[in-house]
């Protein structure tokens, strides 16, 4: 099973690897609490020392929809 991590914009740390849904939910909450409107999530790839993100996706808060939407 793949692990996922991510970060909110203007942050200098990644969240710990976890399931996609758990990472997504945590990043939504973290972004709101940090007054951010953008976060990134991706698949964790071990680099031997730490990890990198692969297939990174950006989500942006959409005021009109009242939801986080994937941004291309």
Task: Specify the residue positions occupied by each region the protein language model found.
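Generic structural motif
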Residues: 11, 20, 44-47
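A short, charged, amphipathic alpha-helix used as a generic interaction element across diverse proteins
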Residues: 18-40
């Amino acid at each position: 099973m793949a692990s996922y991590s991510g970060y909110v914009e203007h942050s200098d740390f990644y969240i710990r690897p976890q399931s996609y849904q758990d990472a997504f939910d945590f990043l939504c909450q973290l972004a709101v609490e940090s007054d951010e409107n953008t976060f990134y999530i991706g698949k964790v790839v071990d680099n031997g020392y730490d990890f990198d993100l692969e297939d990174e996706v950006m989500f942006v808060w959409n005021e009109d929809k009242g939801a986080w939407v994937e941004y291309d």
